[in-house]
């Protein structure tokens, strides 16, 4: 086999698109039951914060939507149709467990089989490796803790005292809807930064692209105020601001069995903590190669 390729979303499909245009023999290994990658696990109300044209992958543009930014279901449908359009050789569900060097090849192991390839593209992303910060007393806390990767909808927190931890877009969006049904507090390491109401995620793509080009060319560029983690003012976040709930407090010091202790020594009873604290690269399968 010329190339083995395992994936969780858009980057993998884009790579497969270009591999398909070569004479290489390749196969795509996907851990999911069906198309959609990490989008299959996003919360119900999740939407892109940029137009469809800015979230497309090579070869076929994502169809536009009439009601603002594409929903989770729209993205999954696009990825499903994209996969079918190009008839990529995909095997699923296959969870790659490790990759090792053998004579003349790289051997890709799953739980029940293996493949030998001259090259391997790891497009596993980060979704399967959520980052949860270490806090003193976390193991003693009797309430619920979950990462945004496992969050589905706000109704599960109705009437509860909830901490939403994390200052990025996921934190702002989850706070916006949980605060409608729960006593929610937003916890961030610093004051969140917000893009202007009339600016969407396109500016983040532009900043990231310019930063990458500068790095490749050895240039130093002046970055605008803010960064790639600035909160995009999508309608639910704007509505939360209008309700007066879009304000954050600094992190607590430690957990107690029934809540948290803040830096000033005060205590708050808490029923649930939603960690919107990002992800780490899901590259543990590369450890046998010594490159991760």
Regions found by a protein language model. Give the residues of each.
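Glycine-rich flavin
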Residues: 49-68, 215-217
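The DNA-recognition helices of helix-turn-helix-type DNA-binding domains
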Residues: 46
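Flavin (primarily FAD) cofactor-binding/catalytic cores of flavoenzymes
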Residues: 1-8, 13-32, 36-38, 67-292
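Glycine-rich loop at the start of a catalytic domain that most often binds anionic cofactors/ligands
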Residues: 43
